[in-house]
Every structure is written in structure tokens, then in C-alpha cells.
């Protein structure tokens, strides 16, 4: 079975109960299945908390965090440091052989600066699969933060959904975007089981899909088109359904290519 990229986000990273549920499901799945799994994560809530403590402003444009040069070290520490090693510690606690990485390790993704206006914010494209294949073949669980490195050697903050898309493209893997939302909702607040690009754009135009969810949906659409396969947006809150998700069943909203 092809690898599955699991993108983790939302408040899961700061929620012990949720982490326990997620890693319990992961542990149970790994004991009975051989499908290679890769975790890609952000950690916006941790960054927001740290910025507040440091009394630094949080500015977002089109769902992306503006990252000035004097803040990239702080954000790198939060994502590639605290968030990544927290997930690694949870993997270790549950007997999973985790390896903490960022997008720059082994050139997993090629990262370029988006614009001067956004600062150290990067766009990720597929990189080299060699390191991940080496780790997966040896039975490791890669845990990848969304911090990248440009060809000029600059640290870049990459949207975690987009980072996960690039890793999925690198491996030719399936992708699920796992967060604190159960999927995409229609205008009546009902969850959609699946959605096409045309329908998604209509919901954006109507103001039903907004802010960070636009970035999430666009990342899923881009991945679905590139991978030529559906991509799912789902919630980690339904721990009892996670094993089904890992097996390819729909528990959220499936984005059609």
C-alpha cells in the first residue's frame, strides 16, 4: 500500500487528551498494518502563544503568517523545536520509532520565498524522496515540521498544509489534512462528504469558506490535481474513526481531483 501523509494541525499539538487518542490509534494501526506513515505538522497555536508572551504582533495575509526576519528564528524554534520534539516524545511514549525532521533535511522539499511582503514565508515544491524512503524502509516514523530552507540557505516558514502537499508529491503518497475541523461545511453548516474544485470555488466566492480554510482547501485541491487522487480533510477529534481513515475510508470531506 502506498504511504500516507498525515498533516497534523489545530489545537491538537497543545491538547494531551487529543494527542493520547491520536497516538493510541496510530500505535494500534502500526501493530496490524505495514502501510508507511509520515507525519507533517505546523503549530500555529504554539507560535501564537509564544508571540503573545514576547509581546510581538501576529499578522496574517490571505491565511498566511507574515514572518519578518527578526521573527523567523522564534518561529523556527516553536515549529522545528518545541512542536516537533513534543510529537517525537509522544511517538516514543507509544513505542513508535520516530525521527524528527524539517523540510530542509535531505532536501525533502524545495522551498522558495513567496514575496517580500510576507517576509520569510516560503512555497514548498517536491524535493528528494531518498531520505524518506530510507527511513520508511527501515520502519521509522518520520515527523516533519513545516520549516524549510531556501537554496540561499534562508530559513522559511511554510504553511503546514502546503508543506504536507509537497511531501505527498515527493513520495507519490496519499494525503489527509487532519485538524480541529471535521471537514468542509456547506452554507447550512452540514459537512460535505466530497467536493469538487468547482463547488469549492463557489463556496469561497460565497464567503462560506474563509481565511485559513481557503489555504487548506486550495492546498488539498492542488494536491488532488497533482497526485491525481482524492485528498481528505478530516478531524482528529473522532479518534475511534482514525484507524478507518488510515485504511483509506472517508471520515471527513474528500477533495476530488
From Swiss-Prot:
GO terms, molecular function: acetylglutamate kinase activity; ATP binding
Classification via Pfam families: AA_kinase (PF00696)
The protein's annotated pathway: Amino-acid biosynthesis; L-arginine biosynthesis; N(2)-acetyl-L-ornithine from L-glutamate: step 2/4
Catalytic activity: N-acetyl-L-glutamate + ATP = N-acetyl-L-glutamyl 5-phosphate + ADP
InterPro entries, alphabetized: AceGlu_kinase-like_sf, AcgluKinase_fam, ArgB, Asp/Glu/Uridylate_kinase, NAGK-NC
CDD domains xref list: AAK_NAGK-NC
Residues in coiled coil: none
Keyword Cell wall biogenesis/degradation appears in the UniProt entry: no
EC number: 2.7.2.8
Binding site for ATP: 180-185, 208-210
GO cellular component terms given for this protein: cytoplasm
Any one GO BP annotation for this protein: arginine biosynthetic process via ornithine
Keywords: Amino-acid biosynthesis, Arginine biosynthesis, ATP-binding, Cytoplasm, Kinase, Nucleotide-binding, Transferase
Intracellular or extracellular location(s): Cytoplasm
Residues at the site labelled Transition state stabilizer: 7, 216
Residues where substrate binds: 43-44, 65, 157
Subunit details: Homodimer.
Protein task: Catalyzes the ATP-dependent phosphorylation of N-acetyl-L-glutamate.
Family from the record: Belongs to the acetylglutamate kinase family. ArgB subfamily.
Protein name: Acetylglutamate kinase
